[in-house]
From Swiss-Prot:
The gene is metK. Binds 2 divalent ions per subunit. Belongs to the AdoMet synthase family. The lineage of its organism: Bacteria, Pseudomonadati, Pseudomonadota, Gammaproteobacteria, Enterobacterales. L-methionine binds at residues 56, 99, 239, 270. PROSITE patterns: ADOMET_SYNTHASE_1, ADOMET_SYNTHASE_2. This is S-adenosylmethionine synthase. InterPro entries: ADOMET_SYNTHASE_CS, S-AdoMet_synt_C, S-AdoMet_synt_central, S-AdoMet_synt_N, S-AdoMet_synthetase, S-AdoMet_synthetase_sfam.
């Protein structure tokens, strides 16, 4: 394979779409804390001065949607009108109904093992051994850049930083291996009182250099720091935000295929979310076991049916055993029925708000990032 470039992006917790994702998942967590069997599909829209929370929720719990919304926006850092959005004064509107009984009858079963999928759909999981967290490097470092922006903003060391930010990293690959970083883009919202010179220098020294490994940077690496020259108006004042609009940022940065379903605001009965987590778990364990250097898995479901309608493995020529054998191993060691994967990954807990910014994958404390099946897979494969 010749040299090639590959790029991924990320956005900070203060990006409008990510504000929406975090509010949706904060509502989900608050409900799951009281009612683990709740059915939640919570969508959020944010724009200057307002938040609209809607969706279908069936639960025995009562939660204060307005308080959850304000607390989430406050924790992100939008706490005064100078930023264009203020947790204390924005309007919070609610338009929530109940889940359709037609859907519910296909999901709930007397035998929980026969719990049907909450919808049809296809999901992908992916892993690669090019980073220590078995994730593609471009999206991993794009996340780390905006996470670092948040850290230095919240610590007060760069007091002119504001919550909205975006990053993009272009890696150079040679014969499929990382050869360096070709380009870095970092745009951050800021207050009026910082010069572009000071901003460029501080972003370079306090955000970019501490995050990106020096051995991948060279004299030819290109840096684009706030390339428009000004980013004062940001957050919901600059753009409206919606739940589920950053599905590539949430997953693999474009390095793997995507089934199209978003994650945030959905309880684990929605296979858009839970089966995508399970697919990541499967792919990561296959790579951790040394059965392939790269692994992508597709699973699909029919609404109301427990068993997946298909399982497909792709290893891009890096497999140590055949893809047919890998598929048999997946069926043997992983229960990909909705109830089975919920139990396998212990998903009925309020763990979701934290997933809603900086990526759902590659963060080791989430249960779908465990590699506890790797040794069994390796032994069963005869390696």
């Amino acid at each position: 394979m010749a040299k090639h470039l590959f790029t991924s992006e990320s956005v900070s917790e203060g990006h409008p779409d990510k504000i929406a994702d975090q509010i949706s998942d904060a509502v989900l967590d608050a409900i799951l804390e009281q009612d683990p069997k709740a059915r939640v599909a919570c969508e959020t829209y944010v724009k200057t001065g307002m938040v609209l929370v809607g969706g279908e929720i069936t639960t025995s719990a009562w939660v204060d949607i307005e308080e959850i919304t304000r607390r989430t926006v406050r924790d992100i850092g939008y706490v005064n009108s100078e930023m264009g959005f203020d947790a204390n004064s924005c309007a919070v509107l609610s338009a929530i109904g109940k889940q359709s009984p037609d859907i519910n009858q296909g999901v709930d079963r007397r035998d929980p093992l026969e719990q049907g999928a909450g919808d049809q759909g296809l999901m992908f999981g992916y892993a690669t051994n090019e980073t220590d967290v078995l994730m593609p490097a471009p999206v991993t470092y794009a996340h780390r850049l905006v996470h670092r922006q948040s850290e230095v903003r919240k610590s007060g060391s760069l007091p002119w930083l504001r919550p909205d930010a975006k990053s993009q990293v272009t890696f150079l690959y040679d014969d499929g291996k990382i050869a360096g970083i070709d380009a870095v883009v970092l745009s951050t919202q800021h207050s009026e009182d910082v010069s572009q010179k000071d901003l460029h220098e501080a972003v370079m020294e306090e955000i970019i250099k501490p995050v990106l490994p020096a051995e991948w940077l060279s004299a030819s690496t290109k840096y684009f720091i706030n390339p428009t020259g000004r980013f004062v108006i940001g957050g919901p004042m600059g753009d409206c935000g919606l739940t589920g609009r950053k599905i590539i940022v949430d997953t693999y940065g474009g390095a793997a295929r995507h089934g199209g379903g978003a994650f945030s605001g959905k309880d684990p009965s929605k296979v858009d979310r839970s089966a995508a987590y399970a697919a990541r778990y499967v792919a990561k364990n296959i790579v951790a076991a040394g059965l392939a250097d790269r692994c992508e898995i597709q699973v699909s479901y029919a609404i109301g049916v427990a068993e997946p309608t298909s399982i497909m493995i792709e290893t891009f020529g890096t497999e140590k055993v055949s893809n047919e054998q890998l598929t048999l191993l997946v069926r043997e060691f992983f229960d990909l029925r909705p109830y089975g994967l919920i139990q396998m990954l212990d998903l009925l807990h309020p763990i979701y708000q934290e997933t809603a910014a900086y990526g759902h994958f590659g963060r080791e404390h989430f249960p779908w990032e465990k590699t506890d099946k790797a040794a069994q897979l390796r032994e069963a494969a005869g390696l």
